Amino acid sequence: MPDYEFSPASGDRPRSWISKQVLIVLGVCLPVILALAIWVGVLTWRQSSMGATDHVSAIVLGRCLTYTRNMHPELRNQDCKKILNTFTSAFVSKDPCNITKEDYQPLIDLVTQTVPCNKTLFWSRSKELAHQYSGIQKEMFTLEDTLLGYIADNLVWCGDPRTSEVKEEFCPYRNENCSSTATSVFWTVVSQKFAESACGTVYVMLNGSRTTAFSKASTFGSVEVFNLHPDRVHTLHAWVMHDIGGVERDSCLGSSIKELKSIVNQRNISFFCQDDYRPARFVQCVRHPEHPSCSVLM
Ligand code: JS2
């Protein structure tokens, strides 16, 4: 078979040339497509999970000792090792999407701390300012100023049925397919206990620079308000704070506060509301002394 090649007339190319082009294109595209698929896969997985806090057990134990040995020595008899084991037993080796309130009951029963009457400060969408305020008004307690809130603040944790270890890498995000995560159930349980143990006049710091300062969907609006005991709590004071230089989207005259007032009054608890409660405004103004809404205070 003479091996002669036709010189290609303009336009039609020999098959081998085309197959080479195809191979080159495939050679280039396939890895790109594969990389894209892997990247999307990782992204979706990342979206369904979030980083668990590294060394949660060590952090919880350390915070417990710091809190009970030098911040609140009156609690020095609390057994921090037992608190840690009781905390982790609530979620290790369990389905991280089906943790129950009962799982945390042994921890709630173990840690006994009473907040003095008239010293409970709730917050909603104003965590930083509430903590700055209670950091100055040291007799006031947010949940994170109590032992259980302090040991877990800003941590993420979960377990896994396949291991008795506390997960170090990723934990499932709380969403419709995974509604009862170890972290979210913990905050619901300790928020409920924090509200149940409140007495006298209690306070809530709300954010009037958000569309609705009060939301029934929030932990404060769905758990804490409904676990205040009217025979122990006679008054709720709301402070609607606005960001310095921020927009005033809601206030004590707003519809969301009217809703809060009616819920609280229906529970036979008196309700008062102040916009930009002055002492908390002072705390905000420490960081913005030049702002006109602060210079008037000086
Ligand atoms: C703290 C966390 C975390 O009154 C406050 C506190 O007592 C708190 O437990 O619940 C109230 C705030 O929750 P709310 O009203 O839903 O306000 P938010 O600004 O939307 O806060 C959402 C987070 C509340 C529960 N929570 N609290 N430290 O690390 C933490 N993680 C979660 N999920």
From Swiss-Prot:
Glycosylated residues in this chain: 98, 118, 177, 207, 268
Identify the residue ranges that face the Extracellular compartment according to the record: 43-298
Active site annotated at which positions?
117, 199
Q: Can you state which reaction this protein catalyses?
A: NAD(+) = cyclic ADP-beta-D-ribose + nicotinamide + H(+); 2'-phospho-cyclic ADP-ribose + nicotinate = nicotinate-adenine dinucleotide phosphate; NAD(+) + H2O = ADP-D-ribose + nicotinamide + H(+); nicotinate + NADP(+) = nicotinate-adenine dinucleotide phosphate + nicotinamide
Origin organism is: Oryctolagus cuniculus (Rabbit)
Any idea which UniProt keywords this protein has? Cell membrane, Disulfide bond, Endoplasmic reticulum, Glycoprotein, Hydrolase, Membrane, Microsome, NAD, NADP, Signal-anchor, Transferase, Transmembrane, Transmembrane helix
Q: What is the lineage of its organism?
A: Eukaryota, Metazoa, Chordata, Craniata, Vertebrata
Q: What does the function comment of this entry state?
A: Synthesizes cyclic ADP-ribose (cADPR), a second messenger for glucose-induced insulin secretion. Synthesizes the Ca(2+) mobilizer nicotinate-adenine dinucleotide phosphate, NAADP(+), from 2'-phospho-cADPR and nicotinic acid, as well as from NADP(+) and nicotinic acid. Also has cADPR hydrolase activity.
Q: Which GO BP terms apply?
A: intracellular signal transduction; positive regulation of B cell proliferation
- Its recorded name reads ADP-ribosyl cyclase/cyclic ADP-ribose hydrolase 1
The entry's localization annotation reads: Cell membrane; Microsome membrane; Endoplasmic reticulum membrane
Q: Which family would the database say this protein is a member of?
A: Belongs to the ADP-ribosyl cyclase family.
Q: Which residues cross the membrane?
A: 22-42
